[in-house]
Amino acid sequence: MKLLSKIMIIALAASMLQACNGPGGMNKQGTGTLLGGAGGALLGSQFGKGKGQLVGVGVGALLGAVLGGQIGAGMDEQDRRLAELTSQRALETAPSGSNVEWRNPDNGNYGYITPNKTYRNSTGQYCREYTQTVVIGGKQQKAYGNACLQPDGQ
């Protein structure tokens, strides 16, 4: 299954869970926890085979949920939109080691993406390691990840 398809399934599941949460839906921290856990599980599933892969899913889900909850607690929709657009631009065009920053003028939250090593994975996809730093209400959170291009260029 393509990564994009998996992400769409996760996003759909998250929105359905929000709808079940009653009027007003889930708060930002709950959404961040849910999406972080799902994203972490997806990332963890890319490593190992058999039981090792299950461990990767579990560890990825746990770490993603914790980090997602912390970040989601303070980020609003504009923060998320700015971070997403900046991430895409940084991973596609920025030189390794450079910081590409976003800043929300309405609340002072900001962050930056630092793309690092570019490589080809075992299936031939071009991938890039990155560091994402987010400062919400003066508190810094840092996450590390890998992003890979799909065969269709996404």
Curated annotation (Swiss-Prot):
<dbReference type="Pfam" id="PF05433">
    <property type="entry name" value="Rick_17kDa_Anti"/>
</dbReference>
<comment type="similarity">
    <text>Belongs to the rickettsiale 17 kDa surface antigen family.</text>
</comment>
<keyword id="KW-0564">Palmitate</keyword>
<feature type="lipid moiety-binding region" description="S-diacylglycerol cysteine">
    <location>
        <position position="20"/>
    </location>
</feature>
<dbReference type="InterPro" id="IPR032635">
    <property type="entry name" value="Anti_2"/>
</dbReference>
<dbReference type="Pfam" id="PF16998">
    <property type="entry name" value="17kDa_Anti_2"/>
</dbReference>
<keyword id="KW-0998">Cell outer membrane</keyword>
<dbReference type="InterPro" id="IPR016364">
    <property type="entry name" value="Surface_antigen_Rickettsia"/>
</dbReference>
<feature type="signal peptide">
    <location>
        <begin position="1"/>
        <end position="19"/>
    </location>
</feature>
<keyword id="KW-0472">Membrane</keyword>
<keyword id="KW-0449">Lipoprotein</keyword>
<dbReference type="GO" id="GO:0009279">
    <property type="term" value="C:cell outer membrane"/>
</dbReference>
<feature type="lipid moiety-binding region" description="N-palmitoyl cysteine">
    <location>
        <position position="20"/>
    </location>
</feature>
<dbReference type="InterPro" id="IPR008816">
    <property type="entry name" value="Gly_zipper_2TM_dom"/>
</dbReference>
<keyword id="KW-0732">Signal</keyword>
<protein>
    <recommendedName>
        <fullName>17 kDa surface antigen</fullName>
    </recommendedName>
</protein>
